[in-house]
Amino acid sequence: MTGLKRKVLIGTITRNRPIMLQNLLKSYTNLIVPDNIDVSFLITENNNEKTLHNVIAEFQRYNITSEVIYTNEPALGIASARNHVLNYAIDHKYDILTFADDDEQVEPDWLLELLKERDSKNLDIVGSPVRFAAPLDKLHWWKNIIWRGVNQVNQGAEKRARTLYDQGKASKLKLATGSWMANLDFFRLTGLRFDTSLGQAGGEDWQLWQDAKEVGAQTGWTPYAIAYETIPLSRLKLSYYYRRTRDHARMVYHERLKKGKAGRTFGSVLSRIYKVLTSTLLLPLQKERGLITIAANLGGLVGFIEGAFGKKSAHYINIDGN
């Protein structure tokens, strides 16, 4: 603590997305910061060397009252980069850490609303919605179908999360780091970190949430702290959502295997088969959303089977966006 002020570190990890990063940092300049908070920004580039000096310098010019720290993490992998930020926050005696992804932008009250939810319920970890930003350019008809489908799926997920929140059951929601806040005393006490053994498979945020719940973390979610994700055109393909879910399923299988729970995969496979069949039958009604559901569940089905045969995921070797 600094006097009566809490120290908050707004963490960002990034790799090969300078334009998207600029947009995120620009949105940070509009954040509403409570009077009892000291905010610093840490931008960690997941690269052997720093390549973003101009981007960081521009951001610093707009943040004359806040400290801006720029570091790099040479060990490739989202978990390694997130741990770099988490360790920095702990070592430098911050009280609160937040994450938003480098392909996002946040609303001005994003930090305020996360803090409000965390403080009102004394939460260790809290998340919030990441909505999809509307495309800036007119899309090809097929890409527009994919866009509408993924947006409908995302809106449905947020609606279900809001229902649980209204029922007082937000602790059941899996929390990703796209819009995320943590009480650092919890991490000091438990020593929990993101699982670097996942490499570039992804899924380290949900895995951390699961590990945190197992050691007693109080977790929650707020519908009021909004972030917006920009979807690159390269992701507006059914094949992308197939690969993404396939790679995630591979990761889940190997995590279950490590914990002696690989037997649960049989149920997961049956569930995906059921969802593919029902979504195919309901496609005339579900339309765009149904296409995404079919592609994703086919990917999950294949991923669990491939995982059982030893295949692992490296989903984030290739980076979408710029």
List each language-model region with its residue ranges.
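Glycine-rich, basic loop-to-helix element that forms the pyrophosphate-binding segment
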Residues: E73-H92
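Short, well-formed alpha-helical segments that are part of the catalytic scaffolds
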Residues: R17-I32
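Acidic donor-binding loop at a coil-to-helix junction in glycosyltransferase catalytic cores
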Residues: T177, G199-Q210
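Short beta-strand-to-loop acidic/aromatic patch adjacent to the donor-nucleotide binding site
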Residues: K93-Q105
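Conserved donor NDP-sugar-binding/catalytic core segment of glycosyltransferases
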Residues: D109-K143
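Short, flexible, basic/aromatic active-site loop/helix in glycosyltransferases
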Residues: I146-K172
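Non-catalytic, C-terminal membrane-associated alpha-helical segments of glycosyltransferases
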Residues: R243-R250, K261-N322
